[in-house]
């Protein structure tokens, strides 16, 4: 009775990919950022139609929130998602941690617009925009995590 050596040998198995390929990471991030910008622009249009001024008091001088400001406001989300994806290559649980941190930062950032010296419509619209960007970050990281 002979023992098959191939059945008893131990082979090193390559570990599974920790995170999605970079192409997928970039696509998920860009799509989430673009979706956030479009939804925030819709919120801005709805707020303007409802009478929100989108004028904030910036140390005594008025600052008007424009459409380009909405685009620029998504850059922290893009950097955060890419950083979480990079860290997720090292440890997979960091993707989920990135989702939690992104969601919490969005919730905490709502305090800024709510405490701003401006009209109520502007406060509500800006707070909603902060939440939209947070949801986009969480969704992008979920798409990246599921692709892993």
Q: Where are these predicted regions, by residue range?
A:
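Short, Lys/Arg-rich, polar N-terminal cytosolic tail immediately upstream
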Residues: 1-23
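Cytoplasmic membrane-interface segments at the C-terminal ends of transmembrane helices
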Residues: 15-25, 82-98, 138-148
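Membrane interfacial helix motifs at helix-loop boundaries and amphipathic/re-entrant anchors
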Residues: 40-73, 110-128
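N-terminal signal-anchor transmembrane alpha helix
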Residues: 22-46
């Amino acid at each position: 009775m002979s023992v098959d050596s191939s059945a008893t040998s131990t082979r090193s198995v390559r570990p599974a990919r920790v995170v999605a390929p970079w192409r997928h990471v970039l696509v998920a991030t860009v799509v989430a950022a673009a979706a956030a910008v479009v939804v925030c622009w819709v919120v801005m249009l709805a707020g303007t139609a409802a009478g929100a001024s989108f004028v904030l008091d910036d140390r005594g001088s008025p600052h008007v929130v424009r459409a380009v400001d909405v685009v620029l406001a998504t850059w922290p989300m893009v950097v955060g998602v890419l950083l979480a994806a990079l860290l997720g290559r090292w440890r997979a649980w960091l993707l989920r941690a990135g989702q939690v941190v992104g969601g919490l930062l969005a919730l905490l950032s709502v305090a800024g617009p709510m405490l701003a010296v401006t009209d109520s419509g502007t406060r509500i619209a800006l707070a909603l925009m902060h939440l939209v960007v947070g949801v986009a970050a969480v969704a992008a990281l979920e798409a990246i995590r599921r692709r892993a």
